[in-house]
Design a protein with these regions (language model features):
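Single conserved hydrophobic/aromatic residue that forms the stacking wall/gate
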Residues: 2-11, 15-16
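Conserved phosphate-binding elements of NTP-dependent enzyme cores
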Residues: 12-13, 17-818
Length: 818
C-alpha cells in the first residue's frame, strides 16, 4: 500500500533516499485503461509539459500524439527531472505539490535507469489496483466495532451453519426409522407425507435406507422441491388430492434458528448446527480493509495470534528495524506494550495468545491476567483479594506468581489470598487458618500468625505442613489389566501428531506446564471420541488419525466441577437418586397409605404435597432490578417446602423436610437399617461430604463438593470394572485433607478394575499415579509433544521435562528410589 504522506514529508524522505541521484518526478494520470488519449496529450502540451511516461517509457510529447485505443495503458506526466541535492529542497517540495495536484494526490519517483517507480500518496491507496483506504482509526482495528468487524460474521470469526452429518447421523437408517434426526421416527404428519410423495417419483418409499436414496431425491428432501407435492386425499380427508409446496428440512431449521422466538425452539435447532470458520475473514474477525494495514509484514490479527513470548520478540524486532522518524513515534507505544507483555510473562502466561477467547481461560488464568493488569497500574494502598490464583499453574511457574504477588505487596499494598497451595502458605507473611473442619463443624479461626508459628500448632493444615500428616506414596504401582487405548496422530491445537498409549486398570495422571496440550489431548480429543462411540455425542473431537482399544471399556464418565444442577431445587438427594428411595419409604408408611398418598405427594416439584405459596422452593424471591435478587423464607411453610398435611407423615419421628435438613453424617445413622438408602448416602460420606445437608441447594456447593457428589453417585452404582473416568484438575479448591479423601475414592474406583485419567499439577496427586503422561516441553507452540510415559520413579530417572524436578524430592522423602 502506498504511504500516506504530505508534500513536505515526501520531499524530506526523497532527500534521504535518493540524494545525489538523477530522478524523474511523475504525476500518474491513467492506470490500466484503454483509449487513444489524443486530447489528454494535447492538454498536457498546452500546460507546458514536455515529456510523458507511457507504459514505462519516457517520451517527448508531440502534436497529434495518440496511443493504441484497444490496449490498456499507464500514463504519467513528467513534472520535473533533476539530480537531488540538499539545496534543491524548495524546488523538490514545489514539484511534489504540482505532481500531487495533477496526479489526484499521488506522486511517483523514478530513478534514472530504474524500471519501477516508488509511489507516494496523500491518501492510502494501492498504486497498482487504485483501491483507496480510509485513514486508520482505533475502531477500524476492533472486531467489536462496526467500523472494523467483518460484515459477514459480525466480528465473531465464526458462523453457524446446519451440519448435514448431524441432520443425518446414520445414513444406514431409513426415514421411517428416524434417519433424519430433526424428524425422528415416522409419525402420521404432513412432512412425512410430503417426503413420501417426493420419494414415490423415484419408485422409493420411507422405508428405503437413506444411503440408497439417489442424490437428486435427497437434494429435494433437504432443500425443497420446485414443484408442488401431491398428498393423497385419504390422508388429508378432502374430496380431491391436495397439492402443496415443500420447502425442505434445511429451510425449516433455518427458519427456527432465525425466526423462532422460543428459546426451546432455538435450543432444539442448535443440536443440528455446527460452527465453522467465517469464509469471508477466515476467522480473523476483521474487514479486509483493516487487515490491509501491516507493521513489519504483520497485520493486527497476525500479531494477536502470537504467543506472549513471541510477541515480546516481535516488538524488539520492530523497534530495531523501524526508520528513525517512525521509531520516534512508536517508541512510547512499544515501551508501554513491552511493559504489559513483561507482566503477563511474569505470571506464567507466556503460552497464551492475545486473541485467546476469554471463555476458554481457566479461573486461574483469568485471575493472573487481572493480576498482571494491577501490577502494571502501579497503584498503592490497595487491598487485593485473590481466590486460588495458582489454579492450573505448574510448579515451575509458581515462583513467578509468588514474585508477582510480592511485587504488589512491596508497592505498598495488602494482598489477601485464599489458597491451598503449600508454597503459597510457606511464602506468606501472615496465615489465617479457618476450621477446624468443614460445614457445621467449621467457621472458626483456629490460627492466625506467621507460617513459622503455625508449624508448632496442631491444626489439620499445620500437621500437613510440618509433616505429622501426609498423603503417602503407594508401596507398589498397579500393573493394570494388560489392555490399552491408544490414540495415533493427534494434531488438535498445538499437538504435534502425538501417539499416546493409555494402559487400562490404572490411575493415570497427565502432567505438563500450562498450555502444553493436556486438555487438548484428553478433553478435546480422547473424551469426545469415546462419547461419540458410546453415546452418539455430537461434539466433534480434535483431529487425530486413529484410535485402538475402545472395545476394552464399556463407558466413559467425565467427572468435572460443574454444578450438579442449575437451580436451587437441585440438591445431593435428588442428584444421587436417594430422594426417590426416601419418598418411596414415606409412601409405604401406614399414615401415608391411610391418606392415599403417592410418591408425588412428597415431591417439592409438583402440586399436591408442596407449599403452593413458594411452589416448593422454601423461599420467595424479591427482584431488586439493578441489584442482586433477595431471597426470604416463605411465610407459610417457613422454609420447609411442604404443606402441613404432608409434614404430618413421619418416619421415626421425622418429616420429609426434617430429613432433607439432615447432614449426610446424621442421615447415615438415621437410615442404618434401610440398605437401599444407606448405600447411596454412605457413598457421600465416604467422599468426605458428611457435613453437607441432604437437601442443600446445588447452587451453594463449591466446585470440589459438586465433583465429589458426582463421584459418590458413581461409587453407589454397580459397575462392570470397565469404566474410564476423566477428571480435569479435581484438586481445585481442595485442602490437603480433602485431596487425601478424594484420592482414596479414586483409588477404590481403580481397585474395582476401572481406569481413572486425571489432568493435574498437584504433586500429591502426581506421586500417587500408577502411570504418568507428561506433555510439553513448553506451553503454546512450544508444547504439544509427548515427553514421557511411565511410572513416577521412571520419570525421575529419565529426567525429562520439568515435572520430575519437583516430583523427585517427594519420592525421596517417602523413601522411594529415585
Amino acid at each position: 500500500t502506498a504511504d500516506a504522506l504530505s508534500c513536505s514529508l515526501v520531499g524530506s524522505e526523497m532527500g534521504i533516499r535518493v540524494r545525489g541521484k538523477a530522478i524523474f518526478l511523475l504525476a500518474p494520470l491513467v492506470r490500466q485503461r484503454k483509449g487513444h488519449y489524443r486530447e489528454l496529450f494535447e492538454s498536457m502540451r498546452r500546460k507546458g509539459y514536455l515529456y510523458v511516461r507511457l507504459d514505462g517509457n519516457i517520451l517527448e510529447i508531440v502534436p497529434n500524439m495518440k496511443t493504441d485505443r484497444y490496449k490498456n495503458h499507464n500514463i504519467e506526466a513528467v513534472v520535473d527531472k533533476l539530480v537531488v541535492k540538499e539545496e534543491d529542497e524548495e524546488r523538490i517540495r514545489k514539484s511534489v505539490a504540482t505532481a500531487m495536484k495533477q496526479g489526484d494526490g499521488m506522486v511517483m519517483v523514478l530513478e534514472k535507469g530504474a524500471k519501477e517507480a516508488k509511489t507516494y500518496s496523500k491518501r492510502l491507496m494501492d498504486p497498482v489496483t487504485g483501491i483507496a483506504y480510509q485513514d486508520p482509526a482505533p475502531n477500524m482495528f476492533s472486531f467489536n466495532s462496526p467500523e472494523g468487524a467483518c460484515p459477514h460474521c459480525k466480528g465473531l470469526g465464526k458462523v453457524n451453519q446446519i451440519d448435514i452429518k448431524k441432520v443425518i447421523p446414520d445414513d444406514k437408517l431409513s426415514i421411517h426409522e428416524g434417519g433424519i434426526a430433526p424428524l425422528g421416527k415416522y409419525k402420521n404428519q404432513m412432512i412425512f407425507w410430503q417426503i413420501e410423495s417426493l420419494l414415490s417419483k423415484y419408485d422409493l418409499n420411507l422405508k428405503t435406507p437413506i444411503c440408497k436414496i439417489p442424490g437428486d431425491a435427497m437434494q429435494e428432501i433437504l432443500y425443497g422441491s420446485l414443484e408442488n407435492v401431491k398428498i393423497e386425499k385419504e390422508k388429508v380427508h378432502t374430496s380431491t388430492d391436495y397439492f402443496c409446496a415443500y420447502d425442505g428440512i434445511i429451510d425449516y431449521l433455518q427458519k427456527v434458528m432465525e425466526d423462532d422466538e422460543s428459546a426451546a425452539g432455538k435450543k432444539w435447532a442448535d443440536q443440528f448446527i455446527s460452527t465453522i470458520e467465517c469464509p469471508e475473514c477466515h476467522g480473523l474477525r476483521l474487514k479486509k480493509e483493516s487487515l490491509s494495514f501491516k507493521i513489519w509484514d504483520k497485520n493486527i490479527s497476525e500479531v494477536a495470534s502470537l504467543d506472549i513470548d513471541e510477541l515480546r520478540d516481535w516488538l524488539e524486532e520492530v523497534e530495531q528495524h523501524l526508520p528513525s522518524m517512525k521509531a520516534k513515534v512508536a517508541h512510547e507505544i512499544i515501551k508501554e506494550l513491552r511493559s504489559r507483555v513483561t507482566f503477563l510473562l511474569d505470571v506464567g502466561l507466556n503460552y497464551l495468545s492475545l486473541n485467546r477467547q476469554s471463555a476458554s481461560l481457566s479461573g486461574g488464568e483469568s485471575q493472573r491476567i487481572r493480576l498482571a493488569t494491577q501490577i502494571g497500574s502501579q497503584l498503592v494502598n490497595v487491598l487485593y483479594i485473590l481466590d486460588e490464583p495458582s489454579i492450573g499453574l505448574h510448579q515451575r511457574d509458581n515462583e513467578r506468581l509468588l514474585n508477582s504477588l510480592k511485587e504488589l505487596r512491596d508497592l505498598g499494598n495488602t494482598v489477601i489470598v485464599v489458597e491451598h497451595d503449600e508454597d503459597m502458605m510457606r511464602a506468606a507473611d501472615w496465615i489465617v487458618d479457618i476450621g477446624p473442619k468443614a460445614g457445621r463443624k467449621g467457621g472458626e479461626v483456629v490460627f492466625q500468625g506467621t507460617p513459622q508459628e503455625m508449624l508448632k500448632t496442631d491444626t489439620i493444615t499445620a500437621q500437613y505442613l510440618n509433616g505429622k500428616m501426609a498423603i503417602e506414596v503407594p508401596a507398589l504401582r498397579r500393573e493394570g489389566n494388560g489392555k490399552h487405548i491408544t490414540i495415533h496422530g493427534a494434531t488438535g491445537n498445538n499437538l504435534k501428531g502425538v501417539d499416546v498409549d493409555f494402559p487400562l486398570g490404572k490411575l493415570i495422571v497427565v502432567t505438563g506446564v500450562s498450555g502444553s496440550g493436556k486438555s487438548t489431548l484428553i478433553n478435546e480429543t480422547l473424551q469426545p471420541i469415546l462419547s461419540q462411540h458410546f453415546y452418539r455425542s455430537l461434539k466433534k473431537p480434535m483431529p487425530y488419525e486413529s484410535i485402538e482399544g475402545i472395545e476394552n471399556i464399556d463407558k466413559v464418565v467425565n467427572v468435572d466441577q460443574s454444578p450438579i444442577g442449575r437451580t436451587p431445587r437441585s440438591n445431593p438427594a435428588t442428584y444421587t437418586g436417594v430422594f426417590s428411595d426416601i419418598r418411596s419409604l414415606f409412601v409405604g408408611l401406614p399414615e401415608a397409605k391411610i391418606r392415599g398418598y403417592k410418591p408425588g405427594r412428597f415431591s417439592f416439584n409438583v402440586k399436591g404435597g408442596r407449599c403452593e405459596e413458594c411452589k416448593g422452593n422454601g423461599y420467595k424471591t424479591i427482584e431488586m432490578n439493578f441489584l442482586p435478587d433477595v431471597y426470604v423464607p416463605c411465610e407459610v411453610c417457613h422454609g420447609k417446602r411442604y404443606n402441613r398435611e404432608t409434614l404430618e407423615v413421619r418416619y421415626k419421628g421425622k418429616s420429609i423436610a426434617d430429613i432433607l435438613d439432615m447432614t449426610i453424617n446424621q442421615a447415615v445413622d438415621f437410615f442404618e437399617n434401610v440398605p437401599q438408602i444407606l448405600q447411596k448416602i454412605k457413598a457421600l460420606q465416604n467422599v468426605g461430604l458428611g457435613y453437607i445437608r441432604l437437601g442443600q441447594s446445588s447452587t451453594t456447593l463449591s466446585g470440589g463438593e459438586s465433583q465429589r457428589v458426582k463421584l459418590a453417585t458413581e461409587l453407589s452404582k454397580r459397575d462392570t470394572g470397565k469404566t474410564l473416568y476423566i477428571l480435569d484438575e479435581p484438586t481445585t479448591g481442595l485442602h490437603f485433607e480433602d485431596i487425601r479423601i478424594l484420592m482414596d475414592v479414586l483409588q477404590k474406583l481403580v481397585d474395582r478394575g476401572n481406569t481413572v485419567i486425571i489432568i493435574e499439577h498437584n504433586l500429591d496427586v502426581i506421586k500417587l499415579a500408577d502411570w504418568l503422561i507428561d506433555m510439553g516441553p513448553e506451553g503454546g507452540r512450544g508444547g504439544g509433544q509427548l515427553l514421557f510415559a511411565g511410572t513416577p520413579e521412571e520419570m525421575v530417572k529419565q529426567q525429562k521435562g520439568y515435572t520430575y524436578k519437583f516430583l523427585a524430592p517427594l519420592l525421596k522423602k517417602s523413601g522411594k528410589p529415585e
